[in-house]
Design a protein with these regions (language model features):
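C-terminal catalytic histidine-bearing segment of alpha/beta-hydrolase fold enzymes
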Residues: 175-228
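Active-site nucleophile elbow and catalytic-triad environment of alpha/beta-hydrolase enzymes
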Residues: 135-149
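Cap/lid segment of the alpha/beta-hydrolase catalytic domain
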Residues: 6-60, 118-125
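Acidic catalytic loop of the alpha/beta-hydrolase fold
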Residues: 163-168, 195
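Hydrolase active-site cap/lid region
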Residues: 89-136, 188, 196-199
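Gly/Ser-rich "nucleophile elbow"/oxyanion-hole loop immediately N-terminal to the catalytic nucleophile
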Residues: 42-86, 103
């Protein structure tokens, strides 16, 4: 996944709708420094041990962000929505499973990092494409894989996936969704690759995620639509 600056405009737009918003950088860097010295191959750092893996502190930062939001006097005391695309979707699924009692809804688009041992089961693995022939790496991968957290998710989930996405293959996303015990709304984007290169390809996600957010903003429950 790329290393880039946070989108202040997107956060301001959500705030204008009445949301208390916190955009979380996946990396430990200053907002004023888009690259922050993060190496291009950061996903390989410490990948043979879960205590040294780069993703450990990424996940811990997410949890601490939630701790902070829960202390805000302007929080309504009940609604926490996790929303993200690609690696942001990966972190959203993880946090929903790590802190299930706090989360109201999860909205993810092409979540990365799922089904990391897919190569061993006849499926295509996606980012971070860790080597499946290294047992130590695979043990680490399965610990950080959102599939490992999905079985603990209690909140309703909206999950969009592109049928021609090779970064976050749809089979891997389904593997995670199948572990979630609660209600899930799969949202297929049939002609979409990773990160939806045109507005038309991501139309399903754009429309449905806004519908869900608006319902939640009005204080209504998100009730996922099941596939027929």
């Amino acid at each position: 996944m790329g290393v880039y600056a946070l989108n202040a405009h997107a956060v301001a737009s959500r705030a204008a709708q009445g949301w208390l918003v916190l955009d979380v950088d996946a990396h430990d860097k200053s907002p004023s420094d888009p690259q922050g010295g993060i190496p291009r191959d950061y996903s390989k750092i410490g990948d043979t041990n879960r205590e040294t893996c780069y993703f450990l502190h990424m996940y811990l930062r997410d949890s601490r962000v939630l701790d902070y939001l829960l202390t805000r006097p302007d929080w309504d005391g009940k609604t926490i929505v996790l929303m993200g695309t690609s690696q942001g979707g990966q972190q959203s699924l993880m946090l929903a499973g790590l802190r299930p009692e706090k989360i109201s809804a999860v909205l993810v688009c092409v979540p990365a990092g799922t089904d990391l041992d897919a190569d061993l089961h006849g499926r295509k693995a996606g980012f971070p494409n860790w080597p499946s022939d290294n047992p130590d790496v695979m043990r680490t991968a399965l610990y950080f894989d959102p599939v490992n957290f999905a079985r603990h998710i209690q909140a309703p989930v909206l999950a969009a996936f592109g049928f021609i996405d090779t970064v976050s293959p749809p089979a891997g996303i389904w593997t995670a969704l199948n572990q979630i015990p609660g209600p899930v709304e799969p949202l297929p984007m049939i002609e979409s690759e990773h990160n939806n290169l045109t507005p038309e390809k991501e139309q399903n996600w754009a429309v449905r995620s806004e519908e869900v957010l608006e319902a939640l903003r009005r204080g209504e429950a998100f009730r996922p639509r099941t596939m027929k």
